[in-house]
């Protein structure tokens, strides 16, 4: 029989014993989240008199856990703990139990004000300048993505990431304290095997996607002279077209990758959805799930882990992985 185990630190507190933990992380979102429920009395300090009710809050009672405290959450079975979340305390909610709301390393960028202009630069240089003096590691796997005529004025760190995601159509996400910017499938990935009905709990939501019509994706960029350039995805049969605007100056080979990624996502007709598991085998976003369909061989194949959410508490440990197509570059 497996026994739940954990190794959680919050600020200066080590081996924190939670009532419940929930976490969520996705390649579509650069803000990882985690909530930790703690026993109320154990994590309060007070100077109440011995005749007062120590379970009641007053102005002389406060929580040991503070906003901005570093948080590290490792969970598993029988001491085989894997890191599920790393970040900072965003807010402490009073109640029974105490709820500690946490965010990943994007938390450090809320108060950053960024003013910088570039005539010619790269996406990696922008995030390197943005994160200087912060405890954020810039991924070595960020591809060279040239950008021209970029200007930020009084932009927050979060707004800079949002610009890279929305204007340049790049994947922007953290792997704990490491920031990655690039194509969705450009980062090295670990492959983990799954067998439906064997080391999974539920796969009812892992279904074949229904398509109404095929759409051809065109990446559209306009330079400073007003000249428009279209980069189409590699698709033969389609019933409609969709233009997606991007920042001018991105290399043509990268534009083709972006177009093909959006094209595959739009017209993908294979299986996708959620699979619920125990805490083992361990998954993180960006992994590849090698699925053995067992009784459903049509579900077999390699899938990209787009998101992971999980829970840990008296009811046991669970993780739900969200699977989608895996584009071969």
Predicted regions located by residue number:
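Polar, S/T/G-rich
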Residues: 121-128, 132-133, 156-166, 220-222
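Short, compositionally biased
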Residues: 87-96, 150, 185-188, 302-314
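Short beta-strand-centered interaction patches in the first periplasmic/extracellular domains
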Residues: 97-106, 140-211
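Soluble periplasmic/extracytoplasmic beta-strand elements of cell-envelope proteins
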Residues: 35-37, 72-74, 86-90, 99-103, ...
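An acidic/polar, Gly/Ser/Thr-rich interaction patch typically located in mid-to-C-terminal regions
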Residues: 21-64, 201-329
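N-terminal export/assembly leaders
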Residues: 109-114, 127-152
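Assembly/oligomerization scaffold segments
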Residues: 1-107
């Amino acid at each position: 029989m497996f026994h739940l185990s954990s190794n959680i630190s919050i600020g200066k507190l080590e081996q924190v014993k939670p009532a419940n933990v929930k976490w969520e992380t996705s390649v579509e979102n650069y803000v990882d989240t985690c909530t930790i429920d703690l026993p109320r009395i154990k994590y309060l300090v007070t100077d109440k008199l011995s005749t007062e009710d120590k379970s009641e809050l007053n102005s002389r009672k406060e929580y040991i856990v503070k906003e901005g405290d570093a948080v590290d959450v490792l969970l598993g079975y029988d001491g085989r703990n894997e890191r599920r979340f790393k970040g900072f305390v965003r807010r402490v909610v009073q109640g029974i139990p105490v709820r500690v709301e946490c965010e990943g390393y994007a938390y450090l960028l809320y108060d950053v004000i960024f003013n910088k202009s570039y005539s010619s630069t790269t996406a990696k240089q922008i995030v390197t300048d943005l994160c200087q003096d912060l405890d954020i590691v810039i991924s070595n796997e960020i591809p060279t993505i040239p950008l021209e005529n970029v200007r930020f004025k009084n932009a927050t760190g979060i707004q800079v990431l949002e610009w890279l995601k929305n204007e340049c159509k790049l994947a922007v996400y953290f792997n704990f304290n490491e920031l990655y910017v690039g194509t969705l499938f450009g980062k090295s990935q670990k492959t983990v095997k799954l067998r439906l009905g064997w080391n999974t709990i539920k796969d009812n939501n892992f279904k074949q996607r229904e398509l109404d019509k095929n759409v051809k994706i065109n990446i559209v960029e306009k330079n400073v002279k007003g000249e428009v350039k279209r980069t189409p995805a590699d698709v033969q049969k389609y019933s409609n077209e969709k233009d997606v605007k991007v920042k001018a100056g991105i290399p043509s080979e990268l534009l083709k990758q972006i177009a093909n990624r959006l094209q595959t996502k739009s017209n993908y007709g294979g299986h996708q959805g959620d699979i619920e598991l125990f805490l083992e085998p361990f998954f993180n976003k960006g992994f590849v799930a090698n699925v053995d369909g067992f009784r459903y061989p049509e579900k077999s194949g390699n899938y990209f882990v787009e998101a992971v959410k999980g829970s840990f508490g008296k009811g046991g440990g669970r993780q739900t992985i969200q699977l989608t197509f895996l584009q071969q570059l």
